[in-house]
């Protein structure tokens, strides 16, 4: 029996939360996210119904006038590998095209072979490899020898850049190894990506979120307990100095953790490993619409 695909309603959230609370070892975020997704004008949430019961859910959101993001696909444990996900995906693509999207992207964790295989079956192509990395601030922080164990700021720090410097930041990244590996993408709210624009850098500078210094450039976002770095531009020889400066910046802001989202360029991943970051590989998929 083919499932009925329809737009989700607020009343569906309770049913969905009942079979998604233990999707992963740590649980699942989907039940908490659905109310916000349902309320957004730039997003759609679709469900698959069989005999009146919701057995699948998936969502898409417009991140720019031409870029859509697929997210939150979940299938009831009793109905997996029965084509429910294959039925939801085309309906999401129809919605995205109607909004003006020319591409749909998604993110899959490296370990999730089932989701990666499903992406390929749906006509997506793997376009980039990224990593999500984090470490506690204070643990293994830069401590020069002979100072009695006290942290001191690194010699090469980062300062807030002026919005007039945004063009220079973009130029330092454009056409380089990091831009190519990233496929020109910028993480939005950590777990979504769209093309980086000059306005992203200039607007960040206006709120002191664009940093610069001899090691390079970085975007930062303040979270309650962490400093997030969704974008940086540096050379291989400066990767260590850049990460050290970001650790210091997070410590100075009183954060407990530094988190970065970067393309999986080998020398940058190696620099993260040398500084005790916990690294989680990610795959980015894209499909023309």
Question: Where are the predicted features?
Answer:
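Active-site rim helix/loop that mediates acceptor-substrate recognition in acyltransferases
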Residues: 11, 20-59, 177-210
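Conserved GNAT acetyl-CoA-binding A-motif
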Residues: 96-111, 118, 252-263
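Conserved active-site alpha-helix within GNAT-family acetyltransferase domains
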Residues: 86, 98, 110-128, 264-279
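Conserved acetyl-CoA-binding loop-helix of GNAT-fold acetyltransferases
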Residues: 75, 81-94, 98, 117, ...
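Amide-forming acyltransferase catalytic core, primarily the GNAT-like/NAT-type
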Residues: 123-223
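Conserved beta-strand in the GNAT
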Residues: 47, 53-61, 69, 74, ...
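Conserved catalytic-core motifs of GNAT/GCN5-like acyltransferases
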Residues: 62, 105-109, 125-139, 278-289
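A conserved beta-turn-beta hairpin within the catalytic core of GNAT-like acetyltransferases
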Residues: 62-70, 80, 220-230, 279-282
């Amino acid at each position: 029996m083919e499932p009925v695909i329809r737009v989700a309603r607020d009343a569906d959230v309770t049913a969905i939360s009942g079979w998604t609370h233990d999707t992963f070892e740590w649980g699942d975020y989907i039940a908490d996210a659905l109310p916000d997704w349902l309320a957004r004008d730039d997003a759609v949430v679709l469900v698959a119904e069989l005999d009146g019961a919701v057995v699948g859910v998936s969502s898409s959101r417009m991140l720019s006038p031409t870029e859509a993001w697929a997210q939150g696909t979940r299938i009831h444990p009793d109905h997996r590998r029965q084509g429910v996900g294959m039925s939801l995906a085309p309906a999401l693509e129809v919605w995205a095209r109607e909004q003006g999207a020319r591409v749909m992207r998604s993110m899959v964790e490296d370990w999730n072979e089932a989701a990666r295989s499903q992406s390929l079956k749906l006509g997506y192509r793997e376009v980039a490899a990224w990593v999500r990395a984090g470490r506690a601030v204070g643990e293994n922080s830069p401590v020069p020898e002979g100072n009695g164990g006290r942290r001191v700021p690194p010699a090469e720090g980062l300062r807030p850049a002026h919005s007039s410097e945004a063009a220079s930041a973009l130029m330092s990244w454009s056409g380089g190894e990091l831009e190519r590996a990233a496929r020109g993408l910028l993480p939005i709210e950590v777990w979504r990506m769209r093309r980086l624009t000059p306005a992203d850098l200039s607007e960040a500078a206006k709120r002191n979120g664009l940093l610069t210094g001899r090691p390079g450039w970085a975007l930062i976002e303040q979270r309650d307990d962490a400093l997030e770095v969704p974008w940086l531009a540096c050379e291989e020889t400066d990767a260590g100095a850049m990460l050290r400066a970001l650790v210091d910046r997070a410590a100075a802001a009183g954060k407990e953790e530094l988190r970065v989202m970067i393309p999986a360029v080998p020398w940058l991943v190696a620099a993260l490993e040398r500084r005790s970051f916990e690294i989680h590989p990610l795959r980015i998929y894209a499909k023309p619409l």
